[in-house]
Curated annotation (Swiss-Prot):
CDD domains: trimeric_dUTPase. Keywords: Hydrolase, Magnesium, Metal-binding, Nucleotide metabolism. Belongs to the dUTPase family. Its EC number is 3.6.1.23. GO terms for molecular function: dUTP diphosphatase activity; magnesium ion binding. Signal peptide: none annotated. Substrate binds at R70, S71, G72, N83, L87, I88, D89, M97. It comes from the Bacteria. SUPFAM superfamilies: dUTPase-like. InterPro entries: dUTPase, dUTPase-like, dUTPase-like_sf, dUTPase_trimeric. Its cofactor is Mg(2+). It holds the Pfam family dUTPase. This is Deoxyuridine 5'-triphosphate nucleotidohydrolase. The lineage of its organism: Bacteria, Pseudomonadati, Pseudomonadota, Gammaproteobacteria, Enterobacterales.
Length: 151
């Protein structure tokens, strides 16, 4: 298992709130919590940037982190990530912040310590552009946006 440096910026983490951990041996994501001082009412259509109380330094250029929504918040309450997916580069060392957006019709209260997103560590391949005049023909060609059908 890879090791990633993490700084605890909020003393409640590891005390009142558990450290992020994988729930099962098959879990891909680590839950991130809202390190708030008081409950936050998120009105319909409102976005807020929430602190997680953690800073990470992945360091390995072959890795990055993705911050993804928790399925229950979006499906049951309409609360999703404001930027849909967050990308944490390997050389970033600041606090992890989570943008949340209430796309639902009702106000939603986020409690201090509530799990608001999940972080997944993913491999990264950097590519270099090779400028060409034409591509080698493929079966698909330039077909996109529904080109392959629905069924």
């Amino acid at each position: 298992m890879k090791k990633i440096d993490v700084k605890i910026l909020d003393p409640r983490i590891g005390q009142e709130y558990p450290l992020p951990a994988y729930a099962t041996t098959g879990s891909a994501g680590l839950d991130l919590r809202a390190c708030l001082d008081a409950p936050l009412v998120l009105a319909p259509g409102q976005t807020e940037l929430l602190p997680t109380g953690l800073a990470v330094h992945i360091a390995d250029e072959g890795l990055a982190a993705m911050v993804l929504p928790r399925s229950g918040l979006g499906h049951k309450h309409g609360v999703v990530l404001g930027n849909l997916v967050g990308l944490i580069d390997s050389d970033y060392q600041g606090q992890l912040m989570v943008s949340v957006w209430n796309r639902g019709q009702q106000a939603f209260t986020i409690e201090p310590g509530e799990r608001i997103a999940q972080m997944v560590i993913v491999p990264v391949v950097q590519a270099e552009f090779n400028i060409v005049e034409d591509f080698t023909a493929t079966e698909r060609g330039t077909g996109g946006f529904g080109h392959s059908g629905r069924q």
